[in-house]
Amino acid sequence: MARTHDDKWDLASSVGATATMVAAGRAMASRDPRGLIDDPFAEPLVRAVGVDFFIKMMDGEFDLSVLQNVSSAKAQAMVDGMAVRTKYFDDYFGDAIKSGIRQAVILASGLDARAYRLPWPADTVVYELDQPQVIEFKTNVLADLGAEPRATRRAIPIDLRGDWPVALRAAGLDTTAPTAWLAEGLLIYLPPEAQDRLFDNITALSAPGSTVATEFVPGIVDFDVDRARQMSGPFRDHGLDIDMSSLVYTGARNHVVDYLRAKGWDAEGVTRSELFERNGMAVPAPSDDDPLGEIIFISAALTG
């Protein structure tokens, strides 16, 4: 089903299921003996969502390499890719803490548990924004686990298509102090104009010294819808009904680095391949089966 301007979802369907998929990847990467990341909450959160495909994947009962055009090396690269992505954004927040930033905003937070697992200074406030049912689910599951946030956590149940800047201010965001923003795994699910509007709003709410991190997929401009639809077929055959071709917004859009620089941010990007090299992992071979291609991880600081 194609996206609409007011579509809804939970963590087992549509865009929400991709958040669960990402958390399953974090759970698997957390078991890796190389110890690149440690997210102890990812696995219990995925189990609580209850999507059988992801549970079997975490338990080793389903090997991704049985899927068409997915070799064992490619399956491992999927997990490694989640490891380097998670570490990049964990390190980003670590650098923000070291610089003295004491408020963080996680947009479309999904099953992100950084408020619970990162070593925040005691006076830090972490704001999380997502759809109401997603916020409620994660909050309740983590409470049932006895987990306690390691910072002051302020969860804001709002769709990012709504007036989230007003909601964020109402929740206590101090726009006179620097903020560390995170938009992880979000941009491909936004129309091009909504991507620009997101960074316009972030800029308007940010004091000098603020930072922002995200990832950008240049291949979304000429995204191969047919190939993505074909790739979704084998997943459906194994019980996972996610059709990426219907979830993402394709077409021309501004490059995030260029757009942020034009807004006064000092922005830099690093490719996923470079992150693999940086972390001592085998760089995946380029694949014609990947409808998105390379991913660029971006961090920026607001000057002035």
From Swiss-Prot:
The question of whether Glycosyltransferase is a record keyword is answered with: no
User: Coiled-coil stretches, from where to where?
Assistant: none
Kindly indicate whether the keyword Phosphoprotein belongs to this entry.
no
The alphabetized UniProt keywords are: Methyltransferase, S-adenosyl-L-methionine, Transferase
Q: Name one GO biological process term.
A: methylation
Gene Ontology MF, one: methyltransferase activity
State the Pfam families in the record.
LCM
> EC no.?
2.1.1.-
Enumerate the residues binding S-adenosyl-L-methionine: D130, D159, L160
- Per the record, the domain of life is Bacteria
UniProt-listed InterPro entries: Ppm1/Ppm2/Tcmp, SAM-dependent_MTases_sf, SAM_mthyl_Trfase_ML2640-like
Q: What class of enzyme is it?
A: transferase
Question: What exactly does this protein do?
Answer: Exhibits S-adenosyl-L-methionine-dependent methyltransferase activity.
The UniProt family comment states: Belongs to the UPF0677 family.
Q: What is this protein called?
A: Putative S-adenosyl-L-methionine-dependent methyltransferase MMAR_1057
